[in-house]
Amino acid sequence: MNIAIRNPVVARKEEGSLQVALDPDLKIETAKVFAVYGKGGIGKSTTSSNLSVAFSKLGKRVLQIGCDPKHDSTFTLTKRLAPTVIDALEAVNFHSEELRVEDFVVEGYNGVMCVEAGGPPAGTGCGGYVVGQTVKLLKEHHLLEDTDVVVFDVLGDVVCGGFASPLQHADRALIVTANDFDSIFAMNRIVAAIHAKSKNYGVRLGGVIANRSAKTDEIDRFNDAVGLKRLAHFPDLDVVRRSRLKKSTLFEMESSPELDAVTAEYMRLAETLWAGAEPCEAQPMKDRDLFEFLGFD
């Protein structure tokens, strides 16, 4: 069977961008699916990769899908920049039946399977369309049938119809944030996007992961106000920076009391999510209300 690479809009000019038409029938039915969002640079790839390892250490079969054109979501798992789905398809002129699994799937640390969706050139195309084609390709090769957990690591805090497309496939959306104004402001916008998508899809907010923060007071105050909950807290430790430079997950770093506490927190988070995190019925604030709500030390 071929993947139908078709233009999802009725027309396209010489210059401009495609918009994605989401397919409500394209579902991942055999795995628990999590989509990880958050402000750009907040540590979503670090969080996603270490969470994937934690799931794998629970004995689960894990697939991580990077949804950023930079295709750097999984490098701490694979120790290299993995080939992207879009590059693999272009190499065979989009004849997907010519692709082998190893052309676009890389096995990473502790058996985590890694896929980088990639994306169109900057300023053209729709990244969400690429995500949809990635899921179709994985289904065509029956890879999702042998998977227990799928983790989507999603570009920045972009909540357009395209990069919101992983929400079509997800059971729970997780938001990574720090204890600062900009991160929480971005989180509120993501809450609004997920709230809108939940009207048409089964995705629900799973909760908040506090990252790179010594304290969580502002996060907790915001959560209480809108109806969110904090699932985990990871402080800003130098070992995290060093793990990225070593192209390694935290589970591969030399043991220390502070590192052991972090990996234990990842294991606890994975256990909580696998057991079934209750959805959060959060209501986002209006931007001006949030501006007045935050800060004022």
UniProtKB/Swiss-Prot annotation:
Name the coenzymes or cofactors required. [4Fe-4S] cluster
Question: Record-annotated residues binding [4Fe-4S] cluster?
Answer: 126, 160
Chain sites annotated for binding ATP: 41-46, 70, 211-212, 235-237
The superkingdom of the source organism is Bacteria
- Span of the signal peptide: none
Per UniProt, Mg(2+) binds at 45
| Disulfide cysteine pairs (residue numbers) | none
Q: What does this protein do?
A: Component of the dark-operative protochlorophyllide reductase (DPOR) that uses Mg-ATP and reduced ferredoxin to reduce ring D of protochlorophyllide (Pchlide) to form chlorophyllide a (Chlide). This reaction is light-independent. The L component serves as a unique electron donor to the NB-component of the complex, and binds Mg-ATP.
Q: Which NCBIfam families match?
A: DPOR_bchL (TIGR01281)
**What is the name of the protein in this document?**
Light-independent protochlorophyllide reductase iron-sulfur ATP-binding protein
Q: Which organism is it from?
A: Methylobacterium radiotolerans (strain ATCC 27329 / DSM 1819 / JCM 2831 / NBRC 15690 / NCIMB 10815 / 0-1)
